[in-house]
Amino acid sequence: MSHTIRDKQKLKARTSKIQGQVIALKKMLDEPHECAAVLQQIAAIRGAVNGLMREVIKGHLTEHIVHQSDEVRREEDLDVILKVLDSYIK
């Protein structure tokens, strides 16, 4: 996963943002807040996780599918990413 290592700082920044959003949500649940505000925070977390997933998938597709010269390996890598997408979309 060389692409993940190369983009490590960017991915870590995204995970830190998600972590902060989850901490804020936990605090919201401990205090009285409007349901709409809680739902908005959950939607923000979901959007941040989706963005992280998009970046990792994009890197994986570029490095392991597009630039893969070995046809067998390319198909194996494609199967892996399709299984991950199936589990993510459920």
UniProtKB/Swiss-Prot annotation:
Its main location: cytoplasm. It comes from the Bacteria. This is Transcriptional repressor RcnR homolog. GO terms for molecular function: DNA binding; metal ion binding. Belongs to the FrmR/RcnR family. Disulfide bonds: none annotated. Pfam families: Trns_repr_metal. NCBIfam families: PRK15039.1. Coiled coil: none annotated. Keywords: Cytoplasm. The gene is rcnR. It comes from Salmonella choleraesuis (strain SC-B67). Gene3D superfamilies: Metal-sensitive repressor, helix protomer (1.20.58.1000). GO terms for cellular component: cytoplasm. GO terms for biological process: negative regulation of DNA-templated transcription. Repressor of rcnA expression. Acts by binding specifically to the rcnA promoter in the absence of nickel and cobalt. In the presence of one of these metals, it has a weaker affinity for rcnA promoter. It is found in: Cytoplasm.
